[in-house]
Design a protein with these regions (language model features):
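A short glycine-rich, hydrophobically flanked beta-strand micro-motif that places a catalytic Asp/Glu
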Residues: 131-137
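A gly/proline- and charged-residue-enriched helix-loop-helix capping module
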Residues: 120-122
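Active-site microenvironments that recognize anionic phosphate/pyrophosphate groups
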Residues: 1-116, 128-131
Length: 137
């Protein structure tokens, strides 16, 4: 485990313990139902998380999105993070779908785009090799 992974591990422990929203939502992961399907080449994991309906049912029309403040720029005071490469902040996701669910936004507000950040994402997965990365933009 490298220094960054150790720092992230402590962040996860602290946030799940000290931040009520994170503590409650990580606690609700006990309600997740999981099935595993195995074939000769892979294991597929199917997950049903009843709490995800909140974000799945959120309004995403243009007017609703414009009316909603950026949740990375307007973070709760309790949400702590770890700075990564001066450009990113590694945060514990308070609405998890996995036991150790992180989110990695830029440290400044910018339109979501992946193209300029491919190399950074490769660096992140290299530095946090125990984690999977997906882009949700």
């Amino acid at each position: 485990m490298n220094d960054l992974e150790r720092e992230i591990e402590f962040l996860l422990i602290d946030q799940k313990q000290d931040w009520k929203l994170a503590r409650e939502n990580y606690g609700s992961l006990t309600n997740v139902q999981t099935r595993y399907f195995q074939d000769d080449y892979r294991t597929t994991i199917l997950q049903f998380n009843p709490e995800r309906i909140r974000s799945s049912a959120a309004k995403i029309d243009k007017a609703s999105l414009l009316a909603r403040p950026c949740f990375f720029c307007h973070r709760p005071e309790e949400q702590k993070g770890v700075t990564y490469n001066d450009a990113f902040e590694i945060l514990v996701n308070p609405y998890p779908i996995f036991e150790d669910h992180l989110t990695v936004p830029l440290r400044w507000h910018e339109k979501q785009q992946i193209k300029p950040y491919y190399e950074d994402m490769l660096d992140i997965v290299s530095d946090l090799s125990d984690y999977a990365l997906f882009y949700n933009g």
